[in-house]
Amino acid sequence: MATMTLDELVRQLRAAYKERLASVVLYGSAAGGDHIPDRSDYNVLVLLDAIGGAPLDAPSAEAASAVARAWREAGNPPPMTMSLEEWRRSSDIFPMEYADILERNRVLHGDPPFTGITVTLSDLRLQLEQQVMGKLLQLRQGALLAGTDAKRQSELVAASLSTMMVLFRAVLRLHGERPPADNVATATRVGALAGFDPAPFLRAVRHVRGEAKLSGTEAGAVLGGYVAAIEQLSRYLDQYTAP
């Protein structure tokens, strides 16, 4: 797999966007202390000045596309690219994502773009409840397709852990708590709040970290515990009232 450092990414973004590049922000696990080497990717937010609303010229657009492809080939999602105006007016649409970015970030280029950006608890609760139910349905579908295949069950557990932690951090923010950097502590606290056993998630964290891989006899039970926990979390959020 090709490699590209964050410094090289910023250099290429500056060359592609020139004066339109306002800010580049690293967010997520790599900025929050729970990055897993050789497994976690790097999430990057790119903010552009509109400069009179004119579209990118063809050479700039082509250069930006080449940067995104190279970053993707290095194992990372393409940069999330927005205009400054879009960034400033979208926190009510993506409150979970904004809350995560606001709390776990590192500015790589330009000015910090966070002044005046807020996330309301009502917006957060609405998106969180929808996302939890959506994840529950995805897990059920994945479990059906995996059947009793332990390898596919383990892959589903590993692939879903990052999203689970995004949801869990949002639950803690809904309660006015700052999520711990450690995924074990996060899952344990959310389990206590919502009334589910966090053990399947703690086991999944060890699996993903490479500390103790899931055995064939464990995978089905861990996946089943995942589904049961998210079912309970969905019920909890449906009945949740702010203190």
Task: Give residue spans per PLM region.
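Short gly/ser-rich loop at a beta-strand->alpha-helix junction or flexible surface loop bordering the NTP-binding
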Residues: A22-A30
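Metal-dependent nucleotidyltransferase catalytic core
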Residues: M1-Y17, G32-R39, V44-F94
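A nucleotide- and high-energy phosphate-metabolite-utilizing enzyme signature
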Residues: M4-D7, Y17, L21, N105-H109, ...
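Conserved NTP/Mg2+-binding pocket subregion across the NTase superfamily
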Residues: S65-E155, A242
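Conserved nucleotidyltransferase catalytic core and NTase-mimicking acidic/glycine-rich helix/loop elements
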Residues: L6, T118-P243
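Secondary-structure boundary/capping signal
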Residues: L21, G75-P79, H109, P179, ...
